[in-house]
Swiss-Prot record:
It is a multi-pass membrane protein. NDH shuttles electrons from NAD(P)H:plastoquinone, via FMN and iron-sulfur (Fe-S) centers, to quinones in the photosynthetic chain and possibly in a chloroplast respiratory chain. The immediate electron acceptor for the enzyme in this species is believed to be plastoquinone. Couples the redox reaction to proton translocation, and thus conserves the redox energy in a proton gradient. GO terms for cellular component: chloroplast; chloroplast membrane; chloroplast thylakoid membrane; plastid. Residues 1-48 form a transit peptide. Coiled coil: none annotated. GO terms for biological process: response to oxidative stress. Its main location: plastid. The keyword RNA-binding does not apply. This is Photosynthetic NDH subunit of subcomplex B 5, chloroplastic. The chain crosses the membrane at residues 115-135, 136-156. Keywords: Chloroplast, Membrane, Plastid, Transit peptide, Transmembrane, Transmembrane helix, Transport.
Amino acid sequence: MATVTILSPKSIPKVTDSKFGARVSDQIVNVVKCGKSGRRLKLAKLVSAAGLSQIEPDINEDPIGQFETNSIEMEDFKYGYYDGAHTYYEGEVQKGTFWGAIADDIAAVDQTNGFQGLISCMFLPAIALGMYFDAPGEYLFIGAALFTVVFCIIEMDKPDQPHNFEPQIYKLERGARDKLINDYNTMSIWDFNDKYGDVWDFTIEKDDIATR
């Protein structure tokens, strides 16, 4: 069965002659315009998919503080939790038994040595000998007081153990920070305070710690 195709007169482009040359009918021009608009639509979709049509966010050009944290105000920023810094929180320590706490305190104290260790070992035997030979109680109290004073002076003059510094200390330049912490762990507390006492005041300008 044959099919007859009927062409509408309007579907056939008309070409008319004029003194300026041939002219194509408006239907072909419309087809060309549709083709161009289709290419533009594809190009717009491609640009949108690549993210090139997004609006660029405003850049924060305000002055930024030295210790300012992103997205969280300094008053609300929990140091040690959010940044993972070496910070101690007493509430996080699991509380054990009374004798366990005493054992932990004893283990945390370094063993005495030198002259301090000598007077520590002689203290209780000296008190026992004084009571055995019926020494006057005043002498025993004076001896105990002298022992306490000498023992505490020697203990306080020892370098402190590594502990938690303020967050600003960890934000110092690496060389200055390591030197500061090393001096803290090796110097007596009195010499350290004389040398670095102003470091804890972050409101004043300071020279380079590494040169001290």
